[in-house]
Amino acid sequence: MSASELKEMEQKMEQAVQALSKNLASVRAGRANPSILDSVFVDYYGASTPLNQLASVGAPEARLLTITPYDKSAIGDIEKAIQKADLGLSPSSDGNIIRINIPALTQERRKDLVKVVGKYSEEAKVQIRNIRRDTNDQLKKMEKNGDLTEDDLRGFQDDVQTSTNDYINKIDQLAKNKENEIMEV
């Protein structure tokens, strides 16, 4: 096992953390954030198109999102897509711009969102552990083939475990920060 293989493992772990960050950004914390609409796809001329390719999304105020379609004829389709996305948002249009008022979160909704954050963080931890398992399997094969000594195997496994612990801690910190942001009244 070379340093490049360890680097590759850490890159995969970093990708899992980045995916978690992206998922957490889509969890609404009571303030307007354009990324909460990243999961919205609009049926535009028969094709499922991401909202951010059809319109610019902005947050001019703490509890307001504005969506300015590049093609005004798509306003109705965009409104339908936002309602269908089941984000708990109600879009309103004046013909040129769609406005979405972000309602304040109830305590019950906050608790539900914390559970969603927990689910996302657990999925990321499982990805990290799977990467660790794959790397350890690769190390054991190398030892079996005679490419590694038993001492080298243990040393590399310790390195893998240290990296795993570091990335699990990063995930826990991201989740904790998001939970605090959600529970902030």
Curated annotation (Swiss-Prot):
A GO cellular component entry from the record:
cytoplasm
For the keyword Zinc, the answer is no
Keywords assigned: Cytoplasm, Protein biosynthesis
Record carries keyword Protein biosynthesis: yes
Q: What does the entry give for GO biological process? A: translational termination
Localization in the cell? Cytoplasm
Classification via Gene3D superfamilies = 3.30.1360.40, Ribosome-recycling factor
Q: Which Pfam families match?
A: RRF
The terms under GO molecular function for this entry are:
ribosomal large subunit binding
Q: What does this protein do?
A: Responsible for the release of ribosomes from messenger RNA at the termination of protein biosynthesis. May increase the efficiency of translation by recycling ribosomes from one round of translation to another.
Under PANTHER family, the record lists: MITOCHONDRIAL RIBOSOME RECYCLING FACTOR PSEUDO 1, RIBOSOME RECYCLING FACTOR
Q: Which family does it belong to?
A: Belongs to the RRF family.
Question: This chain belongs to which protein, by name?
Answer: Ribosome-recycling factor
Organism expressing this protein natively? Oceanobacillus iheyensis (strain DSM 14371 / CIP 107618 / JCM 11309 / KCTC 3954 / HTE831)
Where is the organism placed in the taxonomic lineage, from the top? Bacteria, Bacillati, Bacillota, Bacilli, Bacillales
Q: Name the gene that codes for it.
A: frr
